[in-house]
A protein has these predicted regions:
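Pyridoxal 5′-phosphate
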Residues: 1-195
Length: 195
């Protein structure tokens, strides 16, 4: 199987300054990953029914609302969350979602520290500064998360850390964080983790 066949737009020709046309190379996956063909097909098939969600009684609005709610349930099931105890809130992109979470998270005066790694994009750093006290976790000289520093800061601020905000992978180096291990440590310290 050729994995390139699974995506839309990988063979798009773009102009260079000298007038030549070349195949586009996408180096911006952190912001806008190419769509999967299957997803594009599903969107195309649904467009005839597309309407406002939770805002109308017409047939198309009811179909759109049902599809939206089914997507929420599917997302909760995918992450193993019980819909009786959790809710899925969609955002346009990671920046909007992180801003929403930062403004709605129940920080308290006693528990308002957010651990943020130094590898984070501003969209996962700046929103937290507006709502609590950000403590940055350092990186190793080769750009990896300094897990020893992470552990020290968890211990130093024990009981006061509300949130750990960390990327699954660096959009600069490609380093993949040990998320499961970090989540276990965060939860053991009484903090939530946002990946």
């Amino acid at each position: 199987m050729n994995y390139r066949d699974l995506f839309v737009g990988l063979d798009v020709q773009v102009p260079l300054l000298d007038g030549r046309q070349v195949t586009y190379v996408n180096l911006d996956n952190a912001a806008s990953t190419p769509s999967l063909r299957h997803v594009a097909d599903c969107v195309q098939n649904f467009l005839g029914y597309y309407s406002s969600v939770h805002r109308g009684m017409g047939f198309k609005s009811q179909v759109s609302t049902h599809a939206y709610e089914q997507a929420r349930l599917a997302t909760l099931q995918f992450v193993g969350a019980d819909p009786r105890d959790h809710i899925c809130i969609f955002g346009k992109n990671a920046t909007e979602a992180i801003n929403r979470l930062s403004r709605r998270f129940p920080f308290t005066d006693d528990k308002n520290i957010i651990l943020v790694s130094m590898m984070e994009h501003h969209s996962n750093d700046l929103p937290w500064r507006a709502v609590g006290r950000v403590v940055h976790v350092h990186l190793t000289p080769d750009g990896c998360l300094d897990e020893e520093d992470f552990d020290k800061k968890l211990a130093r601020h024990a009981g006061r850390i509300a949130m750990v905000a960390i990327s699954g992978a660096s959009n600069v180096t490609g380093y993949v964080n040990p998320i499961h291990r970090l989540a276990e440590k965060a939860h053991k310290a009484g903090a939530q983790i946002m990946v």
